[in-house]
């Protein structure tokens, strides 16, 4: 009998129209559990009971999704514009370019009952389980006269899994996601899946029929390694890799895809055509600087400032967990703009949307970083309304932002490209100024 960490869910509708760096702090309750999640094993798999599925079937389903998501539904650089054969990480945006839902999209397996009698394209959309009805409403709003059917799958119809193996060299997908050999499943298989590209070596995402154990469908040890772990342990592993997931962490109609690292996670195709919310995303990618990004954070009390580039999870650590949405500020106490927002956590680790040049040593522009190695940051919050003010004092915990090596490399390469672009622009302006001065000098000589 599997053990799944129980959690309290709160509606985030009241947060959907507020900016993450507003001066008014809106706290969201953190999931609570009687049992502290264990440290994730080097290999294993987890049943993701917090994820839901929507099926989209019909002749227009591919074109329909192509106009709504950040990823490309067609094979890149294919002159015949063939439909992609693999699943992918992606996002649905609103017209202002803010995230509605993070999602995975998979081709419907041919062995599935919904596609067994037709050659029409069909897709499975995996999304935060609490957001299925909201996304379904969004899809129906854009359906218009498209020839397709939308349906939310019932509990037990299919199960979403995360599976990972120990890799001596953490890296991106070992095979080309667009190649014919990218899918390990036979054409008649009822299993859907894809490489989870959100972090190097993070593993695979799989969708199986029914509620049976993953090994029933994939008995080969080469495909599934280790033992099943609970949802809480998967969450710890996800946060250690700096991956935000669901609208408790990627706030609906507030979060921006690049601030959520969706560009690095291969969730955005900057070469594809128009889709809802494309304008701001493309403009930021080509001309802007992403000053805030979601990174893993280490929570600590009075212990020394943690060292290292990645957080360390300690199930025995006695650290108070801040409410989601809490402001991060400098320990020195001087008032100033927020350095970041705490999004959620487990034990002594979590995720936060951080101003990189304040909370880390990353340099984004020629202005340099504003951070100091000795600078500490804190999260302070008041007692819950239901708690007695006579017995509960305001809580506080220290926090350190840690940029994983792969994210640091990605950001640095973008900064270098931006610097080269700026240098090129400055060079052109310098040449134009030189030509202008030469013309003015020539005119003075002729006078």
Swiss-Prot record:
InterPro entries for the chain: TrmE/GcvT_dom1, YgfZ/GcvT, YgfZ/GcvT_CS
Molecular functions (GO terms): transferase activity
Transit peptide location on this chain: 1-28
Gene3D superfamilies: Probable tRNA modification gtpase trme, domain 1
Protein localization: Mitochondrion matrix
Subcellular location, principal: mitochondrion
Keywords, in A-Z order: Mitochondrion, Transit peptide
Transmembrane segments: none
Presence of the UniProt keyword 4Fe-4S in the record: no
GO cellular component, one term: mitochondrial matrix
Chain positions covered by the region annotation Disordered: 367-396
Pfam families associated with the record: Beta-barrel_CAF17_C
GO BP terms: iron-sulfur cluster assembly
Family statement drawn from the similarity comment of this UniProt entry: Belongs to the GcvT family. CAF17/IBA57 subfamily.
Name of the protein this chain belongs to: Iron-sulfur cluster assembly factor IBA57 homolog, mitochondrial
Organism in which the protein naturally occurs: Neosartorya fischeri (strain ATCC 1020 / DSM 3700 / CBS 544.65 / FGSC A1164 / JCM 1740 / NRRL 181 / WB 181)
Lineage of origin: Eukaryota, Fungi, Dikarya, Ascomycota, Pezizomycotina
Gene from which this protein is expressed: caf17
């Amino acid at each position: 009998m599997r053990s799944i960490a129980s959690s309290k869910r709160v509606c985030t509708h009241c947060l959907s129209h507020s900016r993450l760096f507003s001066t008014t702090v809106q706290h969201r309750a953190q999931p609570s559990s009687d049992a502290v999640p264990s440290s994730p094993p080097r290999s294993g798999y987890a049943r993701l009971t917090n994820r839901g599925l929507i099926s989209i079937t019909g002749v227009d389903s591919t074109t329909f999704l192509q106009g709504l998501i950040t990823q490309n539904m067609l094979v890149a650089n294919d002159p015949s514009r063939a439909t992609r054969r693999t699943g992918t990480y992606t996002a649905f945006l609103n017209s202002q370019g803010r995230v509605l839902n993070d999602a995975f999209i998979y081709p419907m397996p041919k062995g599935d009952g919904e596609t067994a009698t037709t050659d029409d394209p069909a897709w499975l959309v995996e999304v935060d389980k609490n957001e299925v009805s909201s996304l379904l409403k969004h899809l129906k709003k854009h359906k218009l006269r498209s020839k397709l059917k939308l349906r939310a799958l019932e509990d037990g119809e299919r199960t979403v899994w995360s599976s990972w193996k120990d890799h001596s060299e953490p890296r991106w997908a070992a095979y080309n996601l667009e190649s014919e050999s990218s899918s390990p499943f036979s054409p008649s298989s009822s299993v859907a899946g894809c490489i989870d590209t959100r972090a190097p070596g993070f593993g695979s995402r799989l969708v199986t029929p029914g509620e049976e154990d993953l090994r029933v469908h994939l008995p080969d040890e080469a495909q599934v390694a280790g033992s099943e772990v609970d949802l809480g342990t998967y969450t710890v592993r996800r946060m250690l890799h700096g991956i935000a997931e669901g609208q408790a962490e990627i706030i609906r109609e507030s979060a921006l895809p690049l601030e959520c690292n969706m560009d690095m996670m291969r969730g955005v195709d900057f070469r594809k055509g128009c889709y809802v919310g494309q304008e701001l995303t493309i403009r930021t990618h080509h001309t802007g600087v992403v000053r805030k990004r979601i990174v893993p954070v280490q929570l600590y009390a009075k212990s020394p400032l943690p060292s290292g580039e990645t957080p360390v999870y300690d199930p025995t650590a006695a650290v108070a967990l801040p409410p989601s949405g809490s402001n991060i500020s400098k320990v020195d106490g001087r008032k100033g703009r927020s350095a970041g927002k705490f999004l959620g956590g487990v034990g002594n680790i979590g995720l936060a949307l951080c101003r990189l040049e304040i909370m880390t040593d990353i340099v984004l522009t020629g202005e340099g970083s504003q951070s100091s190695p000795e600078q500490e940051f804190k999260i302070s919050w008041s007692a819950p309304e239901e708690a007695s003010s006579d017995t509960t004092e305001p809580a506080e915990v220290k926090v350190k932002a840690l940029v994983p090596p792969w994210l640091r490399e990605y950001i640095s390469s973008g900064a270098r490209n931006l610097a080269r672009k700026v240098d090129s622009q400055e060079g052109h302006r310098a040449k134009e100024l030189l030509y202008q001065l030469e013309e003015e000098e020539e005119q003075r000589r002729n006078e």
